[in-house]
UniProtKB/Swiss-Prot annotation:
Protein family according to the UniProt entry: Belongs to the OXA1/ALB3/YidC family. Type 1 subfamily.
GO cellular component, one term: plasma membrane
Protein's GO biological process: protein insertion into membrane; protein transport
Keyword Transmembrane helix applies: yes
Membrane topology, as annotated: Multi-pass membrane protein
Entry keywords, A to Z: Cell inner membrane, Cell membrane, Chaperone, Membrane, Protein transport, Transmembrane, Transmembrane helix, Transport
Name the record gives this protein: Membrane protein insertase YidC
NCBIfam families linked: PRK01318.1-3 (NF002352), PRK01318.1-4 (NF002353), yidC_nterm (TIGR03593), yidC_oxa1_cterm (TIGR03592)
Length: 555
């Protein structure tokens, strides 16, 4: 029994350490176990054959000034304005300085009835900066520091009979080039069309490069206590797939990612929500990510444009996603975009679990009851393994008095004590590890479900019953955490009492320690653990009673 408990404690300890290590990596700190790519391989030189490595690749000519910054003192001052707009999914503001998306509120998250659930994704205030901007490189061309003029000002709201809203902004002429930037907002869509028309109004050919970037600070938003998720830039290409970039690596100029591709996208990821520039596929572009201010970072692409003769123009089309990390929707927008909803190392198990949770919800219509039913189905699938574990625990409980007697008898001779215990196990046909393996097999599934519930924006604002109005927030009255503590205490009391007094005290202390931590967990997560514990108690009670009845029957 001591061996089994030791194994379980080792598993518990390792799980706690791995969760802490994941928290470390999610916050941009180095892993305790896994070196970053920059520690294991030298970064490739800019323009090298591998196309990866950011130690020598920066944004180059991309201006670093944030939107809203004062124009150069050598240029005549121009007054920028904020153009407000509204659609069925967005309320936002476009800054005429650069034609930059300076504010974007996702009002559909509140379904128009719960303003407290609205999320402001893009913003530019004294305390928070998060922008989507673009411009030209390759000469003294218009960029995000120049003041644009709104074309055809008028309707800035999506009316009932409109399917799309277009807002266009024209730059001043610089370097013989004029830019017209058009945003297209489509009804019901979180994908914004961004068309950059480049007119050569000069007398010589020009070869500009379009840059598109996301700029933000490292301030976390809507992150549950004790449940930290990734915040920062990300890059996706066919060659390297999904690559997260930690802010700490950008601080040290040691980030490692693909810097050249003709496919994929760049993104800024946070809990529940993301934004991503998605250039045209098949068009060569450079990728960059860097720190541009003590608290500001950016990730973007630079896409060269073929030479434009005088009097001619060129169009560069791209898409800008800004919305919730709804897995099915993301899959239909761009290859790999669903990976911004990051399950980490348990993705292979978590994705099928979320698919099943979605299917259940499509029939039930309530995410809380869907969690309950999914937990019930998982427990049913693992019932044979759980039964084997509980049977082993019941048999160990029966022989515990004899084990204690042997320990007392041979306490001065550990070798004889171990031999006697092994002989007892052999005689009674008990495997001291019999209860461990079934538990170990189930651990990845339960960890996966934890990450599914933590990462799914569908839980945000989703009610369950009575006092639970938002499964992504903590229980306002702490009823579920109390039930969690009670269920853990009952479950612990059903197990054999450890012979070691220290272990016995720790087993009694665990429900209290866990309940304190779960007081701050999202209600959906606590609901899952409560249901899982209650079902485990029912299983253990049933199997123990069944074994007890079977033993009495022959007598």
């Amino acid at each position: 029994m001591d061996i089994k408990r030791t194994v379980l404690w080792v598993i518990f300890f390792m799980s706690a350490v791995m969760l802490y290590d994941n928290w470390q990596r999610s916050h941009g700190r180095p892993s305790m176990f896994f070196p970053s790519a920059t520690q294991t391989a030298p970064a490739a030189a800019a323009g090298g054959a591998s196309g990866t490595g950011a130690t020598t690749t920066t944004a180059g000519e991309v201006p670093a000034a944030a939107a809203g910054a004062a124009p150069s003192t050598t240029a005549p001052a121009a007054q920028a304005q904020l153009v407000k707009f509204s659609t069925d999914v967005y309320d936002g503001e476009i800054d005429t300085r650069g034609g930059t998306l300076a504010k974007l509120t996702l009002k559909k998250q509140g379904d128009g009835k719960q303003p407290d659930l609205y999320i402001t994704l893009f913003d530019h205030t004294a305390g928070h900066t998060y922008l989507a901007r673009s411009g030209l490189l390759g000469g003294d061309f218009p960029n995000h520091n120049d003041v644009y003029t709104q074309l055809n000002p008028g309707t800035t709201s999506l009316t009932g009979d409109q399917n799309a809203l277009k807002l266009s902004f024209e730059s001043p002429v610089k370097g013989g080039v004029k830019v017209v930037k058009t945003y297209t907002f489509t009804r019901g869509s979180y994908v914004i069309g961004v068309d950059t028309k480049i007119d050569n109004v000069g007398t010589a050919p020009v070869t500009p490069t379009v840059y598109m970037e996301l700029v933000r600070d490292n301030t976390a938003v809507e992150t549950p206590m004790f449940s930290h998720t990734f915040l920062g830039p990300a890059v996706y290409t066919d060659a390297k797939h999904f690559q997260k970039i930690n802010f700490s690596d950008l601080d040290k100029n040691k980030a490692d990612y693909v810097t050249s591709a003709d496919n994929g996208w760049v993104a800024m990821v946070q809990h529940y929500f993301a934004s991503a520039w998605i250039p045209q596929q098949g068009v060569k572009r450079d990728i960059y990510a860097e720190k541009i201010d003590p608290t500001l970072y950016r990730v973007g692409v630079k896409q060269p444009v073929a030479a434009i003769a005088p009097g001619q123009s060129a169009d560069v089309q791209a898409r800008l996603f800004a919305g919730p990390e709804e897995e099915r929707m993301l899959e239909g927008i761009a290859p790999g975009l669903e990976l911004v909803k990051d399950y980490g190392w348990v993705t292979i198990i978590a994705k099928p679990l979320f698919w099943l949770l979605e299917k259940i919800h499509s029939y039930i219509g309530n995410w809380g009851w869907s969690i309950v039913l999914l937990t019930l189905l998982i427990k049913a699938v693992f019932f044979p393994l759980s039964a084997a574990s509980y049977k082993s625990m019941a048999r160990m409980k029966e022989i515990t008095p004899r084990m204690q007697a042997l320990r007392e008898r041979f306490k001065s001779d550990p070798q004889k004590m171990n031999s006697a215990l092994m002989e007892l196990y052999k005689t009674e046909k008990v495997n001291p590890f019999g209860g461990c393996l079934p538990v170990v097999i189930q651990i990845p599934v339960f960890i996966s479900l934890y990450w599914v519930l933590l990462a799914s924006v569908e839980m945000r604002g989703a009610p369950w019953v009575l006092w639970i109005h938002d499964l992504s927030q903590r229980d306002p009255f702490f009823i579920l955490p109390v039930l969690m503590a009670v269920s853990m205490y009952v479950q612990t009391s059903l197990n054999p009492t450890p012979p070691d007094p220290v272990q016995a005290k720790m087993m009694k202390f665990m429900p209290i320690a866990f309940s304190v931590m779960f007081f701050f967990f999202p209600a959906g997560l606590v609901l899952y653990y409560v249901v899982n514990n209650v079902l485990s108690i029912a299983q253990q009670y049933y199997i123990t009673r069944k074994l007890g009845g079977a033993k009495k029957k022959p007598a």
